[in-house]
C-alpha cells in the first residue's frame, strides 16, 4: 500500500512538472544489464541517468560527492565510505553466495592454504570486498595484516601483477574469480564461503532519500531491479550471452559466475544489520576505520521488495 501511494505521488510529480531524473551509479555488467535484458525499464515514470564505474571505490566517491542519487555497492566498500562520513544509507540488500569472493593464486603456486600467505604480497583494492576477504583469510590463519605486503591495485592491474609474478596472491570478486579459474590462469586459495555474509547493497544519498519524489522513484526502481534479477536467473543462457557481450567475457564464463552468485534482492532485516555491525567492528579491529561505527542509522528500512523475490 505504501509503495502504491508513493507511485501515485510520483505520477503526480511527473505530470505537474518536468520528468524527474534518477542518477544511478552502476558497475559494468551490473544492474543496468539485468534491467535492459529483462525489458524492465518500460514505461518508466521518471528518467534514469546512468554512471558506470570500474570498481566500488570510485562509485562510493560519487555517492559521497552527491554526483549520483543511488548505486550498487558491496558491504565492505559501503562501510568504508560510511566510516569516512559519506551521507548515504543502504535501502535494500542483494544476498548472494560469497564463494566467488576469494584469494587467488597462480596454478603453479607453492601456496596451498591461507597459512602460507604470511610474508607474501597480496594485490587487492583498498577497502574493497577483496580486501575484506583477504583480511578474513589472514584472521582465520592466525596471521596479522602487518605480516603481509599489501599491493593496492584495481582489478585489471591486479590480474596482470598475479600473472607476471609481481604479487603472490590476488584477493578479488566475480566475475574475475570464475574467469581466472575457468581459463586456468588462477586457482582459489581461500574462498569467501563461511567468511563473508555475501551482502551487496543498493545505497542512496541522504538528499535523494529526503526528497519524497526521488524516494518514490527509488522504490519503483528497486521493484523493477528485483524482478529483473529473477528474470535473469530464469533465463540464464540468454542473460549469460548478453552479460558476456557487456563485460567482454565468454558467454560461458559470464553465465557461470552469475549462476554461482545465487543472488536475491531482499528487504533489510535485523540479521543484515547485525552482519554489517560485525563487519564494522572487524574493520575497526584491523585499523581500516578509526572509531567504532554504529551501523543502525546507516540503514533506511522504509523500502520493500516484492514477497515473491524472497525465499520463505
Segments from the language model and where they lie:
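Pocket-lining segment of extracytoplasmic ligand-binding domains
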Residues: 76, 151, 156-245
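Sec/Tat signal peptide C-region and signal peptidase I cleavage site
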Residues: 12-16
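Bacterial N-terminal signal peptides
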Residues: 2-9
Amino acid at each position: 500500500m505504501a509503495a502504491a501511494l508513493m507511485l501515485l505521488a510520483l505520477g503526480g510529480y511527473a505530470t505537474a512538472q518536468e520528468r524527474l531524473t534518477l542518477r544511478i551509479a552502476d558497475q559494468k555488467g551490473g544492474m543496468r544489464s539485468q534491467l535492459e535484458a529483462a525489458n524492465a525499464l518500460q514505461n518508466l515514470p521518471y528518467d534514469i541517468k546512468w554512471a558506470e564505474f570500474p570498481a566500488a571505490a570510485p562509485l562510493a566517491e560519487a555517492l559521497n560527492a552527491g554526483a549520483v542519487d543511488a548505486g550498487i555497492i558491496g558491504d565492505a566498500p559501503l562501510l568504508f565510505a560510511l566510516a569516512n562520513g559519506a551521507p548515504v544509507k543502504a535501502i535494500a540488500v542483494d544476498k548472494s553466495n560469497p564463494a566467488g569472493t576469494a584469494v587467488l593464486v597462480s596454478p603453479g603456486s607453492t601456496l596451498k592454504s591461507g597459512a602460507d600467505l604470511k610474508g607474501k604480497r597480496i594485490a587487492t583494492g583498498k577497502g574493497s570486498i577483496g580486501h575484506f576477504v583477504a583480511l578474513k583469510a589472514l584472521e582465520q590463519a592466525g596471521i596479522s595484516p602487518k605480516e603481509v605486503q599489501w599491493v593496492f591495485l584495481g582489478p585489471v592491474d591486479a590480474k596482470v601483477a598475479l600473472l607476471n609474478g609481481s604479487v603472490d596472491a590476488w584477493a578479488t570478486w566475480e566475475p574475475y574469480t570464475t574467469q581466472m579459474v575457468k581459463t586456468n590462469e588462477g586457482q582459489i586459495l581461500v574462498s569467501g564461503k563461511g567468511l563473508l555474509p555475501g551482502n551487496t547493497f543498493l545505497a542512496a544519498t541522504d538528499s535523494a532519500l529526503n526528497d519524497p519524489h526521488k524516494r518514490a522513484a527509488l522504490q519503483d526502481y528497486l521493484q523493477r531491479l528485483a524482478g529483473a534479477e529473477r528474470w535473469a536467473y530464469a533465463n540464464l543462457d540468454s542473460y549469460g550471452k548478453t552479460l558476456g557481450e557487456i563485460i567482454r567475457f565468454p558467454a560461458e564464463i559470464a553465465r557461470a559466475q552469475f549462476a554461482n552468485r545465487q543472488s536475491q534482492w531482499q528487504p533489510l532485516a535485523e540479521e543484515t544489520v547485525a552482519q554489517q555491525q560485525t563487519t564494522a567492528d572487524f574493520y575497526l579491529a584491523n585499523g581500516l576505520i578509526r572509531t567504532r561505527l554504529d551501523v543502525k542509522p546507516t540503514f533506511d528500512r522504509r523500502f520493500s521488495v516484492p514477497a515473491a523475490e524472497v525465499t520463505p
